[in-house]
């Protein structure tokens, strides 16, 4: 997975907790800065791909300190969700950027 444009689409996943997918890159940092308050309000959980070290993970977590952000396998998420790019928000009704 790489930073890039994600085509939004409607999904049907009742009960899914909102989650967002980011990487350790400037595009993801800006996206979080712009949407952080909304993500916190909806209690979204973050998954981060393409993070090289525990130190870099700590930096990424500092971008949105009041939100749970965990490392994840980009390959697995890409296959399961049909995504090639991030950052992206996934809710019970939509995948959107």
Please state what every model-predicted region is.
Residues 82, 87-96:
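A short, hydrophobic beta-strand/beta-hairpin element that forms part of a small beta-sheet core
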Residues 5, 76, 94-97:
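Short, surface-exposed patches at the edges or C-terminal ends of soluble domains, predominantly
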Residues 56-59, 79-81, 97:
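Extracytoplasmic/secreted cell-surface and envelope-processing proteins
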Residues 47-48, 69-71, 87-90:
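Short hydrophobic alpha-helical runs that function as membrane-insertion/retention elements
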Residues 1-59:
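Mid-length scaffold segments of soluble, non-membrane domains
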Residues 62-64, 68-84:
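Thioredoxin-like thiol-disulfide oxidoreductase module
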């Amino acid at each position: 997975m790489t930073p890039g444009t994600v085509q939004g689409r409607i999904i049907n996943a009742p009960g899914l907790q909102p989650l967002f997918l980011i990487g350790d890159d400037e595009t993801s940092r800006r996206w979080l800065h712009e949407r952080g308050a909304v993500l916190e309000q909806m209690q979204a959980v973050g998954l981060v791909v393409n993070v090289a070290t525990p130190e870099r993970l700590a930096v990424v977590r500092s971008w949105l300190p009041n939100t749970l952000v965990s490392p994840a396998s980009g390959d697995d998420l890409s296959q399961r969700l049909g995504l090639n790019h991030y950052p992206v928000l996934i809710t019970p009704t939509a995948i959107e950027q």
